[in-house]
Amino acid sequence: MSRSLSIIWLFGLISGFNIMITGNTLNYWLAKENIALQTIGLLSLITLPYSINFLFAPIFDSLKIKYLDKIFGHRLSWICLTSIALVFFVYILSFLNPFDNLLLFASISLIISFFSSMQDTILSAFRTEIVNKESLGFASGIYIFGYRFGMLLANSGAIYLSIYLTFNEIYKIFAILIFIYLILLIVGVKYCRFDQNNDIEQTTNNNDDIFAFIKNILKPIGSISFIILILIFLILYRLPDNFINVMINPFLLHLNYDAFEIASVGKFWGVMGAIVGGLLGGFIMKKKNILDSILLFGIIHALAHILFIILKIHGKNSTLLFITIGAESITGGMTMTAYIAFISSLCQGKFRATQYSFFSSMMGISRSIFPIISGYIVVNFGWQNFFLFTTIITIPSLLVLLKIKNKLQQ
């Protein structure tokens, strides 16, 4: 079990690192280049591949890469392929500047996001195969620990390095690190022996309609109405965080925090808080069921958003920033752990990759599509109303969660 958890931690690190490349780190790069808030919000669409990766998951479940599969095995061969693609395109991005050619910059970033989301899908499926259902809560905490650590390297580390290096140089370093992670993963998976659930479907009928196929693989989970309810919850629950994440860098720069303060408090302390929150959330879920944990964590996290309003009123204040980021990150780590544990608990039987990707894609929709209006909200209504909005929109998700809980208890 301990070996499996080590591999899961590495899975999390790689996923967290990759998503920052086209996520918050890219967002900070755009903000530093004085790209308009409306444009920054619109470019959250770069992470759209995370919303539709479930469409490609059947390929990862069923299709073997002829030569790599013999050497590395089914999942690891796909990981190798996507990692090499990421190294290549991240290196290309390191020669571009968003201010000079925003369209080309965004296009390459979108390609990186596509391969990153593919790899995230494969790693997530791999994770559901090597952990038994009873350990999902704790394993999710370990995964989030690694995920946040990867985010720390690619986000806080990059912003701190931007004091001394250009972002073009930093993204060249990213390309090298992705290759190193691949080597570590190959060694870890090949030489750490663990029990793996091997009931993964290897063939599928390519003539089947994709929607009929998805309907069939989701059938063991529940009725169509119940699944729709779950999808609505998955979209709404992460919506407040995703709005904030798109605008947090412009907000901190607006308050005149410098790169060192943003890297150390806004990012490093934020990730540390999220790691603590993830582990704390995993520990609590060992004693409390997943749905009750999601409800409790969601309420606490919503209250933490109010601190951003207080920070805006007081202006630049290092102590208040420390408290705000700490409260936001710890409670956010708890909600994320419960969220992932909930998704993982839904996956069962064959085609786990497709099931997990389909549900986690709702998180992608929440992260990529709805936040495109975040910049417009800030420009037209101000920062205080923006953060008030992110607090209020937590309520619908919790009401849907109660509906799900009632259906499960019937």
Swiss-Prot record:
Subcellular location(s) per record: Cell inner membrane
Name under which the protein is recorded: Putative transporter AmpG 1
Pfam families (UniProt xref): MFS_1
Domain of life (superkingdom): Bacteria
Membrane topology: Multi-pass membrane protein
InterPro entries assigned: AmpG_permease/AT-1, MFS, MFS_dom, MFS_trans_sf
GO function term, MF aspect, one: transmembrane transporter activity
Name of the encoding gene: ampG1
Bilayer-crossing regions: 5-25, 40-60, 76-96, 98-118, 141-161, 169-189, 217-237, 265-285, 290-310, 320-340, 356-378, 383-402
SUPFAM superfamilies the UniProt entry points to: MFS general substrate transporter
Family of the protein in this entry: Belongs to the major facilitator superfamily.
GO cellular component: plasma membrane
Keyword set includes Transmembrane: yes
Protein keywords: Cell inner membrane, Cell membrane, Membrane, Transmembrane, Transmembrane helix, Transport
